[in-house]
Structures are given as C-alpha cells and as structure tokens.
Amino acid sequence: VILYGRYKAKINHRLIHNAKKQGKLILVTAISPTPAGEGKTTTSVGLADAMNALGKKTMLCLREPSLGPVFGIKRGAAGGGYAQVGPMNDRQLRFIVDGLGGKVNGTPREDGFDITVASEVMAIFCLATSISDLKERLSRIVCAYTYDGKPVTAGQIGAAGAMTALLKDALDPNLVQTLENNPAIIHGGPFANIAHGCNSVLATKLSLSLADYTITEAGFGADLGAEKFLDIKCRYAGIAPSACVLVATVRALKSHGGVAKADLSQPNLEAVKAGAANLIRHIDNLKNGFGLPVVVAINAFPTDTPEEQAYVEQVCAEQGVPCVLSEVFAKGGEGGKALAEKVLEVMEDRPIQYVYPLEMPLKQKVEAIAKKSTVPTV
C-alpha cells in the first residue's frame, strides 16, 4: 500500500498477478435512469457497509465520480451563493483552432479537449490488465489519417511510450474508505453512453483477490451499463457476478409512468403501475436474458407511500424475484442489512448468457443489443 495522506492510498496493481483467491462478485445496476436519480452508488456503498456489519469480508469497487455532470446541472452539490463554477465551465476548450501563424509556424487545424471520463484513453485504461497491455492498447489509438485515407496510430508516431509513462502511477488502484470505515477501491470511470461505463479491470480483479465479496456497479440502466459490464468487461476479464442487485425507486417508476419531475413527490399509484413495465423488462433482461440471480432493491424515499412500495413488491413477486426495501441513504449500513441478507441468500455461480458471440459481425451485434437488451422509455 502506498499512502497519500491519512485517508487514502494506492495499491500496487501487480499484486493481482500473484493472487490465488477469487471472491464473489455482486453487480449493482438499475432500471432506466431518470432525472430523479435511482441510487446505484448509494445502494452499492450501503450494501458494502451492511455486509461488513454482518461479518462478511466485503470490498466496494466503484468508478471515480466525474465533476462534469455535477457542474453541468447548474452547480448541483457545488455550494450556494454566487456561482463560481457553473458559468465558468470552459466549454470553449472543446473547440480549438490552432496553427494560425502561417506556413512557418504550423498548419491550421481544429482540435479540442475531452473531459477525462469521455476520453478514449480512459476506456482503454480501464480494460488494461498490466502496464505492457496498456502500452499495447494505447499504441493502437488512431490519431490521424494520411492523405490517402490510411489510419495513423499513436504507436506509429512514437507516442505510446510517453503516454504509458504518464499513466504508470494512475494504473495503481485508489484505496479509500466509506463513512463506516470499510474499504473501497475507486479507480477509473469511462462514461457508459460512449464507452463501457465500468471501473477498471485491475481494480475489480484486485478486490476479488483480497475480499470474500466485491460489490461493483455499472453506469446508467441495466440495458446499457449492465449489458456492457457483462458482454465486454466480464467476458474480457474472465469474471462473472454471482448476484445482481437491480435498484428501483417509486419516483422513477412514476417518471416512467408519465409523471413530470415536479410532481414525483405526490402519491400516484396509477403512475407506478404504468411505469412498472420498465422494471419488468429489466428484470427479464437480467434474469432470463443473462441468466443471473436478481434481487430488486427499492431505494426508499420519504415521499413513498406503503401502497406504492407494496405494489412494486407485488410486481417483483409475479416475476419470481425477491424485492427488498433499502434504507441505506437514511440509515447507512443498518438500513441495508435486509438487502445484504437476501443477496447472500440468492447468490449462485452461473455462466453468463451473453447477448452476442464475439465472432458475430458488428452490425449484427448492434442489432442483437437493440432487440434483446435495450429498454424503451417514455
């Protein structure tokens, strides 16, 4: 362990190559996301605290949060008073023209910066299994084209070595702790809508080698993040979850039932019934599509009514999956013990039923994902 101050450290990523132990993996995903938020990360943290409270040696393994989306929602979680962040977001750096000094000083061209989580390098970084593998992957990045249309790679222009050197320390996963002093590895974090939306392979495999149980999450809804987690990350890394927690909220079901965001706090059982189709489809994807043991976690809000929560439980029972009320946001690990116990109960090692075989042509892969996994939303 390499210490960085009193509360955080890095773990040597090379430890996974000497690991013989393989713990159980638990995936946390959610129904289709809404502006109201579903609570995947909240549930993941609370579930890890709950399992440790039950005496289970558990590690949390998450992506690094991005400040971009936070500041993009008008300074959410960035303090009050005069806005120093939102209006000063340097979006102009996404569109840059340079080389305007004439023939002697360069060729005019357009370029721009990506935020880290939207970078191709981040996606590559999170799939790398060693520093040599990282260099090989970076060397294949296409950075330009010749005048006759042939691709030019980072390896061909001699940039791969320097890129790898800049990332060598970043390759070591970050060790932090939850509020209940349980270990959490936070490492990497590509967006799920443009990449695979999971934390690094190195971090997950390291956690599996250290703990009996590893809890991780996949970005966005189960049809996007979980699909990529299973079809890309798990297949490449040779891992598979023994259980899947599908997070749902009464508020999100109302949203999928057609209720405006401003009205989600009002009781509306009929809207919950209308939005339940979204939950049912996600359950079917995970249970019958991928063949995973599933537990639905109702992430409780103070505005939920007992009737609304009872209806969600009824829907889950009809689909043949257990449903547990999760109160980890309000009560921490104590509020997640019932969920932890149910996850431990259903846990089972099963082979993943992938959406597509690797040898399938690209167009057919996209069609398979669209037909088998994607969940339409209102």
Feature names for model-found ranges:
Residues 2-378:
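Flexible phosphate-sensing "switch/lid" loops adjacent to ATP/NTP-binding sites
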